[in-house]
Structures are given as C-alpha cells and as structure tokens.
C-alpha cells in the first residue's frame, strides 16, 4: 500500500480566530451596571463551527487510529472499537440523565451498571465488583488501596509488594503510590516467574504479589496455582493485572487461578476507546472477604429496584466523582451482550491464533526468546539482526501501519512487543510480516532516515527528554 500522510501547519484551537463569526443585529439598551462591574470583552465564540470541524479533521488526518489499520502495540490490546457501542452510549435516555437525579428516575442506568457488575463477576470468577475507577491505572491503584486497608484492618504491618521483572510499569508505580516498597523477582529461562526466587522474596512484610497472566512475554504462567499457594501461605494477597485478560475469555479466569483482587481494562479487553486522556474505566473485582473494602457506591438489586449502596463497612471511600465513567461502562456492557459467552471465548481464540500465526511467519527472521508457546502477544528481539528495534519501528510507520511496542519488556534486548488482537485479518497479518521482513533488507543508513512519509518525522529524543514541554 502506498502511503503518504497529510501534513498541516495547524495551530492549537485557542490560537484560531475567525473574523466576523458573531454579530448582534439588535440594539442593546445602555447598561445600568456601574463601570467597575462591566466586562470589557464579551466571552463570545471566536471560531465558527466550520473552522472547528476543519481544524479537528485536519488533525485527524495527521493521526493514526484503530479505524485506519492494524495497531499491534504489545500489552495494549488495540482492537477495533465497534460502532454499535457508540450508538448505545448516545441513546437519549442514557445521554441526558444527570448523576444528581433521584435513584427512582435512573433505574435503567442502574440496571445497566448492575448487569455489568454481574457480567464482570462471571467473566473473572470473582465475588464483588466496583465500577468506580476511571482508568486501568486508576483501577490498579484502587486495588493497592484495598490491599493497604485490608492489612491495616487486620493490624498487620506489611510494607512490601512483589512484582516480576516482566511487570507493567504501572505495577511498581501503583505500589509506590500506595506507600509500599517494591520487591522484584526474576523470570526463569522459560520467561515465567522463578518460583525459588519468589519463595526467597516472600516474608511477613509481603502484602501482595502483582502479576498479569499471560505475562508481558505472551507466556501463560503455568505455575500460577503454586504461586497462589506460596503467596497465600505467607498471608499475602494475589493481585491480577487485567491487562492481558483478552487472551483467556471462557478458557480460564483470575478467580480460578487463585487471585484475590482483579482490575479490568475496559479499553482493552472490552473494546472501549483508548487514549486522549480519557474516557476510561478500570473496574475492580474482589473475592467475598474483600467486598467491604471496595470503593463506593456499588449497585445493589433487591428484587424490585436498583439502588446505590454506600454502606460498605470498611470501604476505602470514593475514588472518582459520581459513579465511574458511565458512557464507557455502557460500551463495555454492550460489547459483552453482543458477544455473549461463546463470542467472548472466540475473541480470545482468535487473538491467540492471530498472534501465533504472525509469530510463525517471523520466527525465521527474528529471535523470539523464552518458552515457544505464546498466547495473545509475543516479543521478538532484533538484536540478532544487527538492526535497532527503534529504527525498524520507524520504518514500519512509513508503510501506513503502526509500530509495535519497542524496548519493553526490559528483560528482552532490542524488544518489539507485538499484539495483533482478534480484529485484524489474515491479509493484515501477512502485510505486517512482509514489512518486518523487508526492513531487514535495508541498510542501517536507510533505516535511520525513516520515517519519510509521516506527518511528523523523527524527533530529537535527547532534546525531548531534557527539555520537556508538557503544556502550552
């Protein structure tokens, strides 16, 4: 596919001014307000609707999204977001309600939230769910606060959270924000948690072990039941990072594996929108002995009506305003209903199939370390090729498709982490493999000159790191 991305010298919206976009035809009587109370400039729109639409359309043409093509960022599950879910979230009966309305006037919305809680409980084999957290990382931090409050309630001084060396970066960040010290354990030669290292790390100070399964190498932690036994025998909790839940729908579940706390990434596994600083949703599920620690409110049903329950005795309190990101909860609810049990199982089966098909096409050209059987994603290394992962990633962009995650996980040198998801076609996968193979035929000099066809070419990464500009 020939590709040349659009480029505009586009100002930010606040710097755009349209001339003569607003006028008043009527004469306004002289104001009786004293001079010191009069506004000198009226806060009237300065940009016409036409100019606003043009502005954001031009920006979209300089962007890349899941609607444009394959977006195989490892551990991000950049699947296509089905548009029927957008239509559901735009129904007037949902869109026009207000969180301050009496409960008896929003029974439909509460019904949806209750159903979603029940669906997530069933999918994860957990006992209670809060929909409060507004993003995956927010859900993860909420889970850590539950861990903290649980041991405070028991009167136990547990100060450490254990994580594997393949963990997501949010895991140590959330643990640290929660006031815990982070202890890292290494992977074994198969890319799984080293059980002996875990046994050595566990102590009376251990509050929890955080892990995702399959892990960030795309490998299923086959010893998860033994891991659960080690952690629980130490009196600690087992925490499931739901980043890779998309690989196991209908096959196994966090509850069956022995986890005590789970956070869901609705923008990953349940196909709600990614990025842009929001919207997001990261519900948290727990086993029954932790239910009273959940953030409030949760939605209850007494057989006749739905209500918001603020009466959990040991709750960590609220972690967001109102009742979570309702429009995103609607989309996830719609996605689950549309797919059903069999459909969700097929989602995972196709995600695993697509990942292994692409891996098989690339393994003759790139090193794919650790245990050979992969799930929904895999990590290859460019080290054996003499090429840099960064340079190959930039070349991929020049072909109108998105690069994988590069340089993560850190335990693989020159890593490229690839998660195609279930929504891409065989033709997409074949083309992606061809581009990765073609990259190896180019000289280092040619690779370093890429991308040439994107709106933004290579940035000065050293300058960007040293001279941060995070606001206008």
From Swiss-Prot:
InterPro entries: Aminotrans_V_dom, GcvPB, GDC-P_C, GDC_P, PyrdxlP-dep_Trfase, PyrdxlP-dep_Trfase_major, PyrdxlP-dep_Trfase_small
Assembly with partners or alone: The glycine cleavage system is composed of four proteins: P, T, L and H. In this organism, the P 'protein' is a heterodimer of two subunits.
Reactions accelerated catalytically: N(6)-[(R)-lipoyl]-L-lysyl-[glycine-cleavage complex H protein] + glycine + H(+) = N(6)-[(R)-S(8)-aminomethyldihydrolipoyl]-L-lysyl-[glycine-cleavage complex H protein] + CO2
Protein name: Probable glycine dehydrogenase (decarboxylating) subunit 2
Organism: Thermoplasma volcanium (strain ATCC 51530 / DSM 4299 / JCM 9571 / NBRC 15438 / GSS1)
Gene3D superfamilies the UniProt entry points to: 6.20.440.10, Aspartate Aminotransferase, domain 1 (3.90.1150.10), Type I PLP-dependent aspartate aminotransferase-like (Major domain) (3.40.640.10)
GO cellular component, one term: cytosol
PANTHER family recorded: GLYCINE DEHYDROGENASE (DECARBOXYLATING), MITOCHONDRIAL, GLYCINE DEHYDROGENASE, DECARBOXYLATING
Uppermost EC category: oxidoreductase
